[in-house]
Swiss-Prot record:
Positions in coiled-coil regions: none
GO cellular component labels: cytosol
Protein name: Protein RecA
SMART domains to which the protein is assigned, alphabetical: AAA
Homology family: Belongs to the RecA family.
Taxonomic lineage of the native organism: Bacteria, Pseudomonadati, Pseudomonadota, Alphaproteobacteria, Acetobacterales
Cellular localisation: Cytoplasm
Gene that encodes the chain: recA
Length: 343
C-alpha cells in the first residue's frame, strides 16, 4: 500500500512538473490505439509494410541508387495524404523537384509547401519548425546526401570535414524525434547509397549521413530498379523492387515488385495483376490472364489495358486482394526467401 501511495505521489508530481500525459500506464492508451497510416500509393507496398501504409508520427528512410524511384515513391505518399485533406511540405535540398512530374503523380502542387534551402542546418531548422507547428501531415526531405553543413560550404574545395555531416544528422534527429511523435507528422528522409572502401566480404553499400538515421527510422526501405518495361523498342517504365529492411511496427524483410511508368508513376493495374496472381484471384495460363473464368488479356500489357478500360473489374480484384491480405503477405515472405536463394 505504501509503495502504491509513493508511486501515485511520484506520478502526480511528474504530471504537475511536465504536464498531463507525460507519464501513464501503457494499457491506458486507449487499448494501444490503432496506428494512423498514410498509403504509399502502392497496394503491394502497403501490404508488405504490414500496417497498411506509412505510420504517422514516425521517421521513414527510403534509400537506393540513382533513378530508382525514391522521389516518385515519396511524391505518391504526398498525393495520398493530400487526398485525405492533409498539408504536405517538401524540403528540396537537391534543388531538383519537377512540379510537372509531381502533378502527373497526383500531387496538388498549388498547395504543396516547398523549400530549397542553402545549407543542411537551414534545411533541418525549417523541418523542425514545420514539425513543431503540428499542422503538417507529411514532410519529405530530399535528400540526406544534399544536406551540406555550413562549414563545408564556406570552406575551400579540398578541405577535410570528417564526421561533420553525421554529427549534423545525429543532432537534428535527437531534436526532431520527440516533436515528430507529438505532432503525428510523417517525416520521410530520402537517401543515396555509397560504397565503403576496402570491404572484401559482405555488402560494401552504405547510406550517407552516418548511423543516426538508421537508428531513429521506424521503417527503412531499399528501392531498386530491376529491369525496363518496353513498348516495342521504346522504354516506357522501370520494374522496381522495394524491400522493407527495417520495420518496428510489423515483421520486416518483406519485398514487393511493381512498375513505375514514365509520366504516370506506380502502375496500379500492374500491381493488381501481380498481387491477384499471388492471391489466386487472377489466373495465369501461359501468356493469358483470366479472372473468374473471363479472359482479360494475352500478355501483361494487354491485361493491364483491359483493367484500365474496365475499372469495375479492377475495383473487384482490389477488394478481393485486400480481403486476402494475409495470403498475399505470406507470398511476399516466400518470394523473399526465393530471391535470396537465387542471389
Amino acid at each position: 500500500m505504501e509503495k502504491n501511495k509513493a508511486l501515485d505521489a511520484a506520478l502526480a508530481q511528474i504530471e504537475r512538473a511536465f504536464g498531463k500525459g507525460s507519464i501513464m500506464r501503457m494499457g491506458s492508451r486507449s487499448e494501444s490505439e490503432a496506428i494512423d497510416v498514410i498509403s504509399t500509393g502502392s497496394l503491394g507496398l502497403d501490404l508488405a509494410l504490414g500496417i497498411g501504409g506509412l505510420p504517422r508520427g514516425r521517421v521513414i528512410e527510403i534509400y537506393g541508387p540513382e533513378s530508382s524511384g525514391k522521389t516518385t515513391l515519396a511524391l505518391h505518399a504526398v498525393a495520398e495524404a493530400q487526398k485525405r485533406g492533409g498539408t504536405c511540405a517538401f524540403v528540396d535540398a537537391e534543388h531538383a523537384l519537377d512540379p510537372i512530374y509531381a502533378r502527373k503523380l497526383g500531387v496538388d502542387v498549388d498547395n504543396l509547401l516547398i523549400s530549397q534551402p542553402d545549407t543542411g542546418e537551414q534545411a533541418l531548422e525549417i523541418a523542425d519548425t514545420l514539425v513543431r507547428s503540428g499542422a503538417i501531415d507529411v514532410l519529405v526531405v530530399d535528400s540526406v546526401a544534399a544536406l551540406v553543413p555550413r562549414a563545408e560550404l564556406e570552406g575551400e574545395m579540398g578541405d577535410s570535414h570528417v564526421g561533420l555531416h553525421a554529427r549534423l544528422m545525429s543532432q537534428a534527429l535527437r531534436k526532431l524525434t520527440g516533436s515528430i511523435s507529438r505532432s503525428k507528422t510523417l517525416v520521410i528522409f530520402l537517401n543515396q547509397i555509397r560504397l565503403k572502401i576496402g570491404v572484401m566480404f559482405g555488402n560494401p553499400e552504405t547510406t550517407t549521413g552516418g548511423n543516426a538515421l538508421k537508428f531513429y527510422a521506424s521503417i527503412r526501405m531499399d528501392i531498386r530498379r530491376i529491369g525496363s518495361i518496353k513498348d516495342r523498342e521504346e522504354v516506357t517504365g522501370n520494374q522496381t523492387r522495394v524491400k522493407v529492411v527495417k520495420n518496428k511496427l510489423a515483421p520486416p524483410f518483406r519485398q514487393v515488385e511493381f512498375d513505375i511508368m514514365y509520366g504516370e508513376g506506380i502502375s496500379k493495374v500492374g500491381e493488381l495483376l501481380d498481387l491477384g496472381v499471388k492471391a489466386g484471384i487472377v489466373e495465369k495460363s501461359g501468356a493469358w490472364f483470366s479472372c473468374d473464368s473471363q479472359r482479360i488479356g494475352q500478355g501483361r500489357e494487354n491485361a493491364k489495358q483491359f483493367l484500365r478500360d474496365n475499372p469495375d473489374v479492377a475495383a473487384s480484384i482490389e477488394q478481393r486482394i485486400r480481403a486476402q491480405a494475409n495470403l498475399v503477405e505470406a507470398a511476399m515472405i516466400t518470394d523473399e526467401t526465393e530471391t535470396e536463394a537465387a542471389d
